[in-house]
Amino acid sequence: MTSPPKNPAPFPPFTRHSSERIYDSPWCGLRRDVVTLPSGELQEYHVLEIGPAVTVVPVLPDGRVLLIGQYRYPHGKTHWELPAGRLEPDEEEEAAARRELLEETGYAPDQLLPLPGFYPTNGISAHHASAFVATGCKQIAEPTPDSAEQITVGLFTREEVEALLDAGQIQDAFAALPLLYWLRGTHLQKKSSPAS
């Protein structure tokens, strides 16, 4: 395997002079910072604060992938996505991945294989998502989604997942990026986590 190219040389950081929390909710917060840019210019920078999250590519023993169809209020549409959600306080990423998969689909994995994590909105937030491939998934319960979640479960072959991605039908970054990593076999190069 080819080694990846190095990251670009780091730029000088911004200097933060003040930080004010201007909005809080159970789901997110908004912070207004006053910073000096490397050029010396003073500027306000608004930062969206969202806790860490997980997303899971569930793979059944026959190789099919489980996707969830979910309605999203902000744009009023239903799309195919992956089971995903925020970590509870003091919850480990793997435990959160198992919990979200079970809650949203009723499925549990034999094994979790880590994928590279990512920052879905790195221009406005330090929000980070950990990603996993869940292998050997079997249904062990009925889904128990949150009251605001409208979810349906669909099973897709690898070729159907590729077709959905190619057609632009998977538009959620929490689904598209981990699915692309899975299709490339990235999870096979990582250390596995056995079922608990």
Predicted segments, located by residue:
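Unchanged
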Residues: 43, 52-55, 60, 86-173
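Conserved Nudix-box catalytic region and its N-terminal flanking loop in Nudix hydrolases
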Residues: 2-13, 45-48, 55-99, 147
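Acidic, metal-coordinating catalytic segment for phosphate/diphosphate chemistry
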Residues: 14-55, 61
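Short glycine/serine/proline-enriched coil/turn segments at secondary-structure junctions
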Residues: 25, 74, 122-124
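Hydrophobic residues on conserved beta-strands that form the core of alpha/beta folds
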Residues: 16, 30-32, 44, 68, ...
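Long hydrophobic alpha-helical segments typical of transmembrane helices together
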Residues: 162-196
